[in-house]
Amino acid sequence: MNKLFYLFILIASLFILTDASHFRFGTISWQPTTDYRTIKFTSNFAYRTTFFYSSTSSIKVGNLVNVGTLNFGSGVGSVTVSVTVTDFDVKNNWFTGTFTTTKAYPAQNSGTIREYTAIFTSCCRISSLLNNKDASWNITTSVQIDNKNELSMVNWSPVSGMIPIVQVVANKNNNFRVIASDQNVQNADSSALTFSFSKVYTMTQPSGMTIDSKGNCYFLPTQIGLYSTQIYILDSRGAYIVVDFILQSVAEPGTCDPTCSNAGTACNQNSQCKGCTNSGSTTIDTCTTSNYPPDFVSPPTPDDGDTKLFPIGASTSLTFSCKTIMSGRSTTIQTANLPVGVTTKTPVTGATSNTTITWTPTTANTGSYVVSLVCSDSTGLTSSVRSFTILVAKPDCGNGGYTESGVCKCVDNWDPASKCFECKDGYYGENCVAVPPCVNGVPNSGINGDGKCLCSNGWTGADCSISSSQSCKDLSNSNTSISYSNPSFVNPTKVQVYLTSTPNYEVPTIVSIPNPINNLDVYVLVDANLASTTAFGYIKSGMSTFVSNIENICETAQFGIGYFSDYTPSPISFSPSQVMGSPIAAAIGLYKPATYSTTSNGNSLLAATDAASASVGWNSGSFKVIVIITDSDHSSSSAQITAFTNKFIGKSIVPVVVSFGASSMTNWNSALTSAGFGSVVTASGTSASDWSAKANTGVKNVLSKIVYKSDPTATGSSFVSSVPSTVTVSSSSSTQQTVNGLKLSLPSGTTIVSPVATISAMGYGQTDISINYNRPPVATSGSFSVNQNSLATFKLTGTDPDANILQFKFTTFLTANAGVITDSNGKDVSKQQSNYYAASEIFTYTPFENYLASNTIRFVAFDGCVESNTYATISITINKVNQLPECSSISSTITTTLNTQSTFSMTATDFEDASPFLQFTKPTDLTAYGTFTYKGASITSSTKITTGDSVIFTQTVNPKNDATVTLEFRAIDTSNAFSQASCSVSFKIQHANVAPVSSSTSPISVIPRGSVSLTLVSTDSDSTKALFTITAIKNGNNGNFYTCSTNDCSCTSGSSDSTIISLKDQFSGISYSSTKANKLICFTNGEPSAISNYASISFTSTDDEGLESNTVSVVVNIVGDRANVAPVVTKIQDYSVYQDYLDSDAHVVTGTDADIDDYNPPNVNNLIAIITTPPSNGILVTVQNGNNVATQGNAPFTHYYRPNPGFKGTDSYSYQVMDTFKETSSVESTTVTVNPINHKPTLTVNSYSFTSQSGAGETQTLVTYDFDGDNVLCSVQAAPKQISMYDSENELITTLPKSLSSNSYSFKLLDASKISPTPFSSFSDSFIISCKDDSKLTTPYGVLSTGNVTGFVQFTYINTPPTTKGIQVELDQDTTEPFTFNGTDIESPSDLKAKIYALPANGQLLNGNVVLTSKLIGEETYELDALSYKPNAGLSNWNTIDNIGPLDSIPYSVVDQQGLVSDSDVVTFSVRPRNPPVYTGADVIDVLQNTRYPLNVQGKVGNGGSEVNIQVLKFSGRGTLSIAHSMGSEGTMDTEITSYPNSQTGSTSYNFAYMPPHNEYGNDFDFIEFKLFDGDLYSELYTITVNVIHVNQPPTIQLISYKVLDDTSKDNGEVLFDSTYIVNMNINTSVLIKYTGSDVDVDQVTPLLSTVTTALRGTLYTKDETVPDLKGSIIDRNHTTVEQSSDGYYYVVYSPVPDSSGNSYVRIPFFMTDNGGLDSPTLTAVINVNRYNIPPFVLAGNKTYSTTTKLALSVENVQFDDPDSGKSNNVSIVVSIVGENDENVASLEDIKISLKRMQNCELHTSLASISCLDTKSALNESIQTITVNAVTAGNYRLKLFVDDLGYNAPSAIRAQSHMNATGYVDVTFEEAETTTQTNDNKTVLTGAIAGAAAGTALIAAAAWRLLRKAAPPTDTFFSEAAFLGDGVSSNPLYEQSASAAENPLYQSASDTTD
């Protein structure tokens, strides 16, 4: 059963694959040939066989199949791909084919490599693919054109292959390998390949598939079906290929492995097997099967990945063997991608099968070939894919050559200079045969040549012996000058003939028709108005038989189909349906005619004419026939019959008319008899088989003979004197013969320009004859300009239709004062008025000095026989040259003063302008110090300042020191031309002195009869010395302020070393240190007891420049008075600390005292602790981490010991205690042991600078130090952002941190373009380094780090010269081509100019319309894209020696904006001697409304061209334009073109589909603009006009808007309907609804009828403008129509039932009816009748509160109410403290706020704001008491903001319906009383509130976090007014929120998301 199920799945999947699209597999490889730019491409593709053939057995190895176009890369052309079939698989319906071609790429400059991307792409992939279905395939490879390396070292691409369809098992592990070979076999170091999924074009890789870098694929497909994959294969030199193939996933039932817990259980996939040993493996299945597939036998079969060498010239064979172990089964081997020429034999079949391949490669086959094999058994099971490489190695000597003494000896005609790989001169092709004669040209020789003669300029013919450029007098006989022969039944297809007066010049033609015929196109034109549905049914059912009958005549026949209708009331002349190559039997099966009638307007002949005129996808080189099936004769006029005949002749189409049931076809018989071609057959009309058989007979009739006709509409028809007689086509053998009888004669007196005669061999093809005869030449007008006081050169040009050599003669000359024109000999042409000048003559025009007027001269052309009929004009324009302005520098420096205006002016002069302007280059250098204005506006780098006008600079910035700023400026004239030199003005920005600030400690205390010191302090940032002045002094009764000469207070007041301080005493010369100057003074007293405010002293300080500070006062208080007993000190026990670290334990100096006033623990301890002897090797500090030295202090006196840096050992200090009477205790000492520790190392990082020209920076070494002598190891923690940093080994630092082995580093700038923010500029950057030691100490810690140290690096950018590279400009003959010089500059790539050193020899350079002269190029530089090249008339690449070109070249350099010049290089001009393709289709198409139109665009190859490609440039876009892909029997697939231009290549006929937009029509409806191109040669712009023909359509209706009436709560404006058609109105109001209808039909002339269904609730009225409420008549079941208003709209008024409301209250349907009775779709308005939402309000009992800081303030009785909020819905409030006059929220550092109840509230983290969300009762309880506590005094307001969240509004508009209110309570906090008050508290508070303004938005965020838990967020609620506005905001109920539609689901109250 399992096996049967497996076979069913396998067969089903194969069936699906067979019925799919056609692409299966593809890969492209390449290799250079005899030179670096000639590349040989080898492509392998696989397709579905039945897409190209009628059955899988019809294909044969060696068949040629055209599969598309290979594009060689952007701008270098393409080639049609015709693969040679190499393998095919009958069972799986695919074949593989190989295509080889050679492409010569444009030459590269020496030392350069250019990469192109070759691509083979088309649509569409298989529709049933599980990934990438219906997508385009893109097979690409990167092609390297390498002119840098020797040819032997030039890269070859990889090569790969695969079976087109690889079978895999679903839900199981599938492992296979993609094999590829690196073709660089001539190199000793063959590069490795890497594999990955392709990302060249976007595609989806199979889910569950991976690939490693070696090409091993692992795939566990989870679905049964087809997958596509593309593998990317890259070699080490950057060349890649892809291999694209299909994976077919099939089911394979099995049982679980014995190691599984459910062993033996039936399974279909690995995941169904549980607990297995190999679970999760990517290579071993746990669901196994005993149904084993076949496998290859090795040997003889090559192993996967093997390489087999096939020597050149030797026959080599390989055998493949496959076997199965399953009894009763046989095996077969399928190969893929065999090289062309390999023969295959299969001598053995059965359980074991063998296949042998044999091949004898030639030198042309050099390279690698990846061949793939798969083995399948008779049940459909397949082996894994086996792939190997066939290597044809390139020998030392090719093509039979041999080596003798190290030199190649060649046989036959091979060239030893190429080691026998290239032909000798004069030989061509793979066999090096002799080239045919080539008289005046160069033969296309070489191994890749075709032997054709490439003629030199002026010669033509097969051997280039016929002159095509000569004087007319040299031609005396008629001759055939050019003949083109394309693949066709009739040859030649194009002929060029020169006719003289000799009559009846004969042009021979050849016919070659195979039997059976190989190309047949049949277009079926069906009458869609037959007599009955039964009759049309016969046509449908017989179409398949007809197709089969025709395919019996030609197996590859293609079909198209279209329709016409002869229904008299509404006939249709022609409507195309399917283009050529379509399944017409299926198409007609879906077609439904609109009418069946026996009446006819007889338009079948007109329909046939239109069908022949249309582009229906005819294939080039096919026999073309239109089969017209109709049941009525035509009734056309004679003019229409003539038009029919001419159209069929012009298109070489033959008609076959099938009379379907008609008694006679008299008119058709007559028309075809008169025409002389075509066939009429009669069918019964009652049988499908009869008409199909008769139609087949008609086609055979027209195939049986060749009827020649001359197209009378061709311009050269009058030149045809006779055509050949009818030729009979053999029915049993091929017909090949030369046909005579085509004769031409020159009509007398003809003036036809470029006549072309068309001779049609009806159906089989046609010959176009371009006829030349001597006609007058045409002189070509031109113009040029020359700069004032300069000169210009020019040539005279003209054209001759016969390519005769031209001469020219002047007919008018310059006026006397205009200047002089001289010839190349310097002679004035006005003195030689009868001279003829050659076309190569160069004339020079020199205008007289300062002559500026325009002038013209005239001339005629002469071809040797006649002059041109009209003269041509040369227009001369003299360009006035603008003189640059000049500016003047300001010599004196402008000195500025702070906050003072400085006014100055600048001057400039200009030759043309009286008042030029001036502009500053960089005014920001000055505006950094103040304001810089002109006429009141700030000056920028674009400000234009009139010369002499004043500008003002006001210094507002006080620099630390005086600064000098120099500004550059330039003059600019009215043409925006700048002065060549810059000028300057300098400013001295002066520093302004700042007054000092005085300070001191106050009050200070002193004991009775004691002394105390105090310090006078002055602070100043810009002075060096201070002067202190005593401004007031109060000594007390027994006190004195004094100083000691020892600068301390150790002296006694009144002693010789003391000085008493008096009023106005001064202390001068006090130095500032760290901005502070200190003066120590002393105070002593003789008082016996304590006295408060006993003494005081006031002082100021003055700086160096005399600025005086504020006045500071110091108050002295006297404390203490008693009897005393000496205290006792307490000893501190010895202790230890760590080296260099403060002791972590506090130590205390204290003692005891018998005096209770001094010592009474725990309440009194007035002892003073004194350090009598400080430690010798350390210090004592009072705070553990502080710096204050512990000398004395109140006992207990806490101190910490800090050893001196680096000290270790023992130390000691002594101490005692002193009581308040200065009695001291004895002295005690304590010993401290300092234990050694590890020290942190130090690091110094020096700044470094370098430039862009210094390359890599010099190595920098870090400066490190370790106190302990440890090693210091450093690492980079952060590298510079813009500079590359390298480690000690000079390796780029890419990961951080990075160790520096020798503590050194260096820098290098990799890419100056990435400097940010300004590329190519100088900048500073930083980096961070940290170091650590390697200490062995561990206590108290081990290894220590320096921490992060920042270093700085300065990069200076130095401008570099630009660079250039030669370019090749390609253009068409006789055209002008703009081009762009190739220049690059890393600093300013967009600001380069070109400098030209010489003019082209064979053409002109144009700057606009000005022809460049040697004078111009000597003085000017040009924008890179400013110039165009125009070759001289008639010249092209053919005029060069090798006929390849280029025609011209010029040397040039580029100059950057700094004037640096690049090295010179060359622009070459390659002029193509070809004509573009020509569009042959209709310019206008008629498309039925709402109907797809198959648009086929056909073109003809231009004379001398090779391709017809199309580029759709523009589409007007009202409809849809798509590319139509023919999928064979599957019909067509349309892919919309979404961007333009859109290009297609590889055919002469391109299929599109046009679809008009729904219900739109009209003439000139859409426009399609396109060009045809051949390579990069483009045709003129073609435009197809699309007319969309009207088909009657129903009307449409549109609801416009509504307006609520009777509602006074809001502005009742007009509201536009959205797509929901919802009306929102309030209770007890009415609404006016406005709507309209439209009809696309032009016959709808009366207003549409509006019908409205009666409302189920409420009342509907018509609108009556005469009554106030607008309510007209009631609309009920008897009155449902609404008349159109005078403004063109329709109106109804709706009123709901009074006092009722609700969502979706009522639905009102509307529809329209046209005057034909068609109804529009119905639109329904949904009425929501809503309740009113009442705004909340705020109440406050007391609106003013005041208190002092640091006291809590309770605000009571602040409440709010929302009338329509209930007990359950939430309301939002925000309680905050704001400023007195603004809405800025105060900071928590200034004021704090709290509520009585904080549940469901959130306090802001930094601002005085609380956000709450709860019911209104709960919130009112919360705010019953609001507590406010201010730190900073000031006037505040308590603000309560309430939002009702719109809960009373309907949910649909709740987001827009929030109502809110705001209330305030004033709160004032006075400053608590203090001894001093130096600042205005209000000022401080204002600053504090202003500083908190930025936090206001954060309060909104806090409210949002609460609110979003229970309410939908809206922008109305969270607008700025919600938090900052005063009072109740305006009602937002009817304001549309911009984000109203973005309403998220409510979140639960537990949501804590921020």
From Swiss-Prot:
Glycans are attached at residues 138, 354, 479, 1348, 1382, 1628, 1678, 1742, 1770, 1820, 1860, 1881. The chain crosses the membrane at residues 1884-1904. The gene is sibC. Residues 428-465 form the EGF-like domain. Residues 1905-1954 are cytoplasmic. Pfam families: Ig_SibA, Ig_SIBA-E_2nd, Ig_SIBA-E_3rd, SIBA-E_N, vWA_SIBA-E. Coiled coil: none annotated. This is Integrin beta-like protein C. GO terms for cellular component: membrane. GO terms for biological process: cell adhesion; phagocytosis. Disulfide bonds join 438-453, 455-464. Implicated in cellular adhesion. Belongs to the SIB family. InterPro entries: EGF-like_dom (IPR000742), Ig_SibA-E (IPR056851), Ig_SibA-E_2nd (IPR056847), Ig_SibA-E_3rd (IPR056849), SibA-E_N (IPR056844), VWF_A (IPR002035), vWFA_dom_sf (IPR036465). The keyword Signal applies. Keywords: Cell adhesion, Disulfide bond, EGF-like domain, Glycoprotein, Membrane, Signal, Transmembrane, Transmembrane helix. It is found in: Membrane. It is a single-pass type I membrane protein.
